[in-house]
């Protein structure tokens, strides 16, 4: 559900259901976040409110955003998805700069000339992930008019696109969210040329990697096993949250590895639990280390990365008061870069976390840039049962070393 925010520093207020249904959609930044003026009990009520499904006879169709730098192999991966969909009805939305649509569409035909996709909506000028969202939303609405035909929607973005604004669209547009849900962002990486990609002045390679829920390391056949290890180390320093899959020629036999990730829900937390466990067990913040003689792999100059992963430990068994302090820290951290006149000291692209409160209940934190949600979990995550793992929030972004950690009593 959307909350209209005029001042980013203000706490979002609950909106009456009837009021939401009758008011026209506003272009004002809407931040769906759980918050409370009083205590954590109000937060629980609001969480339930946020999780109420819209009146629909059909479940939301999962949308996969497929991104990656130019030439990484997105089209090859898309063809692999369509060839191995095992009866799944997949709608495809292309979003490439230039007039390559007919060419790429022809690549989606099997040897008999039969089209491998259910629906094709082409957008010109790479508008989907750039500054204009309207055309992309209209294209999705066109697909959703035939919603019953599809099991999945795949959006292939332009190679120079930032997937962040598109991902936010599924949270910001309430009417759209009732028909589709963001399932995951899949970024394809050209392992052979990743060094040049990360040196690009636009930083788009970093940004695409940082937003990913699943990273496809493509063209692994063109590099040595040692070089592949360097690539994996570099990727983990930028984004420790994403699932990593290695491919050649974009071939993927089991498409369930990248479709139906449920990366933004509260039902499947296994990958986040694994990420938190990995961050507890390994040095994922190596991009900030200063020891030039350290034993980590640095062939891709990871010491100079200003986009990286950083973890912040959270106190276990949060009380009502501590939870309110945590919310205040989250708002300040995620929203401070929105304030006019402020220098961009840091930028957060993706955030995830798991924490608990003192009554034994557990929660998952999800965020893309300044938009975040907190949702209750039905049970204690398995990883926390099997090991002594500390609750934490993981941030992916730029210059994260400038962020003050959450300290109880300092908010």
UniProtKB/Swiss-Prot annotation:
Residue ranges annotated for the CobW C-terminal domain, each copy included: 307-411
Q: Which residues bind GTP?
A: 68-75, 130-134, 218-221
Q: MF terms per GO, please?
A: GTP binding; GTPase activity; zinc ion binding
Presence of the UniProt keyword GTP-binding in the record: yes
What SUPFAM superfamilies is this protein classified in? Hypothetical protein YjiA, C-terminal domain, P-loop containing nucleoside triphosphate hydrolases
**What are the BP-aspect GO terms?**
intracellular zinc ion homeostasis
Short sequence motif named psi-PxLVp motif, residue ranges: 9-16
Q: Which reaction does it catalyse?
A: GTP + H2O = GDP + phosphate + H(+)
Q: Which PANTHER family match?
A: COBW-RELATED, ZINC-REGULATED GTPASE METALLOPROTEIN ACTIVATOR 1A-RELATED
> Could you tell me what this protein is called?
Zinc-regulated GTPase metalloprotein activator 1
- What organism is recorded for this protein? Schizosaccharomyces pombe (strain 972 / ATCC 24843) (Fission yeast)
